[in-house]
């Protein structure tokens, strides 16, 4: 047997045939937990989802808690990767994975369900920009991180690169500046269109300067490249996520802390919990959203394109009403399931066994269906105005044989037809939807939400978009 076949034999058939993961780069101001614990909290949680996300890089950078970034703080990121190096052998049991790919193969394209080696993640941790503000962008500010972003964009890979800014986004700003200096306008445009950035507020400055938006490189990116760089500036989801973490802290104490090596380094409560987590929950391939459409409500919030919190630039955001209340409403709805999902993964980290999420399969014979049935991406169904549409999720299953509970609901904010539609028997495995006669030319977003009956009552979703003709 060839070396490659021997390696592939260690992967389950499901993983070998799975779709590719979403690509993610994290910019973190991780540091001393006595100063700010939430980056460490979010980093632990991120590691428990390494089978769902292709971690292209984790870069240290400035944030509200520091400028410049202290070099000695990199040890806290190393601590997280060291803990992952212990727990990954239990975590990979979740995918029936017996071995790792070669490092060369890991550096290629990873599929959903694959747990990367700790060596791979260590090789992808590096320094980003360690000084804040637009004033430092330019010559002398290149870093391993900004150079690596350019390298990632140049790879032969059609998948977008999501940048989750837990601190400042200035490492991306520096990469953009460098490409602007060295490439043509069309090449710069192509570079920008490879990236999407989700920022947890604007942290390209220390906390005391947080209202001085002109200081930040974020404003430069928003003003200069608004037509080509998809930018989500979150000011509605992370604050509530922090507060809900306080409300649910006892569950963190019982079912996260102390579970596995990752749980043993999960910080003790100081103040708000995991403020940065929504940025990577946003790209979670759980069937609830297509990250390319920020109006779709998911674990990372719900956003509308409009005026930013600097009252000058425009991006996808949720800081103003009514979207602020809308995204908060969805976050309150999803949070218990989000936390249960994390806790279940920490059980795997500790014990190498536990519950797995159900698999949602939705079919319909009522219209022309587009999309992969077993993909986490939404499916589209072309339907006629005034018709009845039958959606059937009875072929959904649970890896552990658990009973499944169904709930179908409409998300009007993502739909171009914003009025309620009639969903008959919304708690059955199959439903009939009456398409209104005045919905011609519109879209209607329906979500099939499925819980199992096992520990933590894990959830999975499927979004169905009815394209009304």
For the regions a protein language model found, what residue spans apply to each?
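N-terminal acidic, glycine/proline-rich low-complexity segments
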Residues: 14-390, 396-418, 430, 438-441
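Short, solvent-exposed loop/turn segments at the edges of extracellular beta-sandwich modules
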Residues: 451-457
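Short beta-strand segments within Ig-like beta-sandwich modules, predominantly Fibronectin type-III
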Residues: 422-427
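Bacterial Sec-dependent signal peptides at the C-terminal "C-region" and cleavage site
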Residues: 4-18
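Extracellular and select intracellular beta-sandwich modules with Ser/Thr-enriched
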Residues: 457-464
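Short beta-strand edge segments in extracellular beta-sheet folds
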Residues: 465-469
């Amino acid at each position: 047997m060839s070396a490659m076949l021997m390696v592939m034999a260690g992967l389950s058939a499901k993983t070998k045939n799975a779709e590719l993961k979403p690509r993610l780069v994290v910019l973190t101001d991780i540091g001393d937990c006595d100063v700010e614990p939430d980056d460490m909290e979010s980093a632990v949680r991120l590691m428990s989802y390494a089978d769902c996300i292709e971690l292209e890089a984790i870069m240290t950078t400035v944030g509200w808690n520091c400028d410049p970034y202290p070099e000695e703080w990199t040890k806290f990121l190393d601590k997280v990767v060291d803990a992952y190096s212990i727990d990954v052998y239990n975590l990979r049991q979740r995918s029936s994975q017996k071995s790792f790919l070669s490092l060369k193969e890991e550096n290629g394209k990873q599929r959903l369900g694959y747990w990367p080696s700790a060596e791979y993640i260590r090789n992808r941790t590096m320094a980003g920009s360690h000084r804040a503000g637009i004033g430092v962008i330019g010559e002398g500010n290149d870093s391993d991180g900004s150079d690596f972003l350019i390298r990632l964009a140049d790879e032969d890979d059609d998948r977008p690169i999501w940048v989750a800014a837990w601190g400042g986004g200035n490492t991306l700003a520096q990469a953009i500046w460098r490409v602007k200096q060295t490439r043509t306008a069309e090449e710069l445009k192509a570079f920008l269109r490879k990236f999407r950035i989700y920022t947890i507020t604007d942290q390209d400055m220390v906390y005391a300067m947080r209202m001085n938006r002109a200081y930040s490189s974020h404003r430069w990116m928003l003003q200069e490249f608004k037509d080509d760089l998809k930018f989500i500036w979150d000011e509605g989801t992370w604050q509530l996520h922090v507060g809900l973490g306080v409300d649910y802290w006892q569950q963190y104490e019982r079912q996260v802390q102390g579970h596995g090596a990752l749980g043993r380094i999960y910080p003790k409560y100081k103040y708000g919990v995991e403020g940065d987590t929504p940025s990577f929950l946003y790209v979670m391939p759980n069937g609830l959203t297509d990250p390319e459409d920020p109006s779709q409500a998911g674990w990372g919030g719900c956003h509308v394109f409009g005026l930013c919190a600097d009252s000058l630039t425009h991006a996808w955001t949720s800081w103003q009403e009514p979207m602020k209340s809308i995204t908060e409403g969805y976050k309150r709805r999803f949070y218990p399931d989000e936390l249960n999902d994390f806790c279940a993964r920490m059980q795997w980290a500790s014990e190498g066994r536990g519950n797995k999420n159900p698999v949602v399969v939705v079919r319909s014979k009522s219209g022309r269906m587009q999309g992969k049935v077993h993909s986490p991406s939404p499916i589209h169904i072309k339907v006629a105005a005034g018709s009845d549409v039958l959606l059937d999720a009875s072929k959904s299953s649970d890896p552990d044989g658990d009973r499944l509970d169904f709930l179908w609901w409409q998300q009007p904010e993502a739909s171009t037809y914003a009025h309620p539609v009639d969903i008959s028997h919304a708690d059955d495995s199959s439903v009939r939807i009456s398409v209104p006669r005045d919905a011609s030319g519109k879209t209607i977003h329906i979500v099939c939400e499925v819980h199992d009956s096992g520990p933590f009552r894990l959830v999975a979703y499927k979004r169905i978009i009815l394209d009304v003709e």
